[in-house]
């Protein structure tokens, strides 16, 4: 709630800057450099917020699990950019061996291309969430209509093919702009980024990827790995093959439980219902 309030106040402040700058320019034409500078600074702030995946300035954003889930020592393992038929089946087998659940942020186009694999993810007890339809690298440059098309097409594809309706959205590379928040509200989606990531699309050293994920690891963390676009190790294997089992062993050693984001959401809702009014 505090983060949502901060987002609303920031939007009001941004609008006020524009109105004040315009009024000042009309009333005092010689003040136009100050007005232009204020507007430019405001837009620079908006751009910086969009380039910071964990920012909450542009709207509500899960960077950690809710308090109730954190108190239960839950951790969310999220896996992006699939499904990939060359990688995802083995990832599912690793999760099965450890009795772990994960959240797969899937690209809608890949869900359409690999329908049975997407259904298999859900059948094995994991959740599939929305990662846009085409994962365009320029997602943060899209206008509201194009952004809604990306989100909506993925939402429809995932729900139609798997029978599971996503509750969460993660922007491609985590980058976004102010148009995204109203789009997500329209589709009743919660933005989710991460607490820590392994940079496993560019780092082939499994030990280094693992260290990035477990350094400071605590209940409530949201961790990011990739089954799609995964870096390969010296043997040509996706780095997630080595990182994921070691990560799950580390979670068990620290008495942390991997859960889906949807399970964490339910846990938070149940805790709210139990709390005295």
Segments and roles (model prediction):
Residues 1-64:
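N-terminal membrane-anchoring alpha-helices
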Residues 49-70, 234-277:
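C-terminal domain-boundary segment and adjacent tail
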Residues 50-139, 150-153, 157:
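Active-site beta->alpha N-cap acidic-glycine motif
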Residues 79-81, 106-108, 130-132, 170-173, ...:
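A cross-domain feature marking catalytic cores of carbohydrate-active enzymes
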Residues 82-86, 106-114, 137-145, 170-178, ...:
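Acidic-and-aromatic substrate-binding clefts and catalytic sites of carbohydrate-active enzymes
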Residues 135-142, 230-234:
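A short acidic, helix-capping loop that chelates divalent metal ions and anchors anionic groups
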Residues 146-151, 206-211, 237-244:
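Charged helix-capping and loop-helix junction motifs
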Residues 175, 180-217, 256-267:
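His/Asp/Glu-enriched short active-site or ligand-binding loop at hydrolase and phosphoryl-transfer sites
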């Amino acid at each position: 709630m505090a983060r949502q309030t901060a987002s609303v106040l920031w939007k009001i402040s941004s609008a006020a800057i524009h109105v004040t700058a315009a009024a000042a320019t009309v009333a005092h034409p010689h003040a136009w450099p100050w007005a232009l500078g204020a507007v430019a600074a405001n837009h620079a702030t908006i751009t910086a917020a969009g380039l910071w995946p964990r920012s909450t300035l542009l709207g509500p954003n899960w960077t950690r699990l809710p308090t109730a889930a954190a108190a239960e020592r839950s951790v969310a393992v999220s896996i992006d950019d699939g499904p990939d038929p060359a990688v995802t089946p083995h990832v599912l087998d690793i999760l099965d061996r450890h009795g772990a659940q994960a959240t797969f942020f899937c690209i809608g186009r890949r869900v359409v291309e690999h329908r049975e694999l997407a259904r298999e993810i859900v059948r094995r007890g994991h959740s599939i969430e929305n990662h846009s339809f085409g994962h365009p690298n320029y997602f943060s440059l899209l206008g509201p209509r194009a952004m809604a098309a990306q989100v909506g097409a993925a939402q429809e594809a995932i729900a139609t093919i798997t029978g599971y309706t996503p509750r969460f959205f993660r922007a491609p590379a985590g980058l976004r702009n102010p148009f995204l928040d109203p789009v997500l509200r329209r589709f009743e989606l919660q933005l989710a980024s991460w607490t820590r990531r392994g940079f496993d699309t560019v780092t082939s050293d499994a030990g280094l990827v693992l260290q990035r994920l477990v350094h400071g690891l605590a209940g409530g963390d949201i961790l990011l790995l990739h089954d799609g676009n995964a870096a390969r190790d010296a043997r040509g294997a996706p780095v997630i093959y080595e990182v994921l089992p070691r990560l799950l062993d580390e979670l068990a050693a620290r008495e942390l439980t991997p859960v889906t984001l949807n399970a964490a959401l339910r846990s938070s809702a149940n805790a709210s219902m139990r709390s005295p009014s």
